[in-house]
Amino acid sequence: KTGDEALLLARIAPTLVCRDRPAGARWFEAMSDPPSLIIMDDGLQNPSIAKMLRIAVVDARRGIGNGLVIPAGPLRAPLETQLEIVDLIILNAGPFDAGRSETDDTPGPDVQADLVAFFRDRGFRKPILRGGIAPRNDLAALRGQPVLAYAGIGHPERFFNTLRFGGVEVVETVTYKDHHLF
């Protein structure tokens, strides 16, 4: 039994869902053709596996929220602790589109620059990269077509804007809770 994210990832790479992270890593290592790289989601707080590279992906629109730890805020550990162990930060923006619409939630360059300054002010001197989501060519068949878009993800506007950026005519949106069972 697993969630939708693992099933989507399994379409493009060997994927394992395992509560016991070290056991999962050993499973990959025991494969006849083991991967040279293992990517863990939410692995920063797990000290049981040695890591070669720790990457923090930060939503460029939301930043770090109120800066507090769960349940008072969105962080899983204090920011100072995370910045000490992270090797690289990626500011994840929405679709790259110079002509954003008024409803697009993609942060402009000034918002991303503010985040870079924010992390630099806290002593983070390692690389900070800017990334984003770009639609794949699969959207070609939908371009110019009226579409009802529905999503059961944490921040559905980013998905809807990706469709719009890809040329899809989104006439209506329906939003469900994150990980909704369709």
Spell out what each predicted region is.
Residues K1-G123:
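Phosphate/Mg2+-binding loops and adjacent switch elements
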Residues A6-L7, N137-L139:
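Short, flexible, solvent-exposed loop/turn segments with mixed acidic/basic and small polar residues
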Residues R19-R21, A60, A134, Y176-H179:
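Short, solvent-exposed coil/turn elements at secondary-structure transition points
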Residues M31, G99, D121-R122, P127, ...:
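Generic signature of intrinsically disordered, low-complexity segments enriched in small/polar residues
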Residues Q45, R62-G63, R136, G154-P156:
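Short, solvent-exposed loop/turn segments at secondary-structure junctions
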Residues R54-V58, L83-A93, G123-I133, L139-L148, ...:
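Conserved beta-strand/loop subsegment of P-loop NTPase cores
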Residues L139-F182:
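Redox- and metal-dependent alpha/beta enzyme cores, enriched for Fe-S-associated oxidoreductases
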